[in-house]
């Protein structure tokens, strides 16, 4: 399940995404996530809601995304702030919902 909220100022948006990919956000899916986030000017942060004390990390950093250790079934909070925040969250939501391009 995916939920998306856009703030009233339209310069901020967030989504809670459930990762269904069998490998979670391991190397290839994480790289696709970072590549997608990096297309946008907005500051994009991610945090694993399924793990206690998960840090909020830069979603444009492969090391940051790997640090949150997202496994299959985990819920990921993604927040964007900037002029293209809504578009960024939409693209990341589509990537996760599309299982990172995998048919499995």
What are these regions (language model features)?
Residues 2-10, 31, 35, 89-91, ...:
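Long, contiguous binding/interaction regions
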Residues 4-10, 44, 78, 83:
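N-terminal cationic amphipathic segment used for targeting or macromolecule association
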Residues 7-9, 50, 60, 86, ...:
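Intrinsic disorder/low-complexity detector
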Residues 12-16, 75:
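Intrinsic-disorder/low-complexity, polar/charged segments enriched in Ser/Thr/Lys/Arg/Asp/Glu/Gln
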Residues 18-70:
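Compact, glycine-rich, soluble single-domain proteins
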Residues 67, 71-104:
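C-terminal structural segments of small proteins and small subunits
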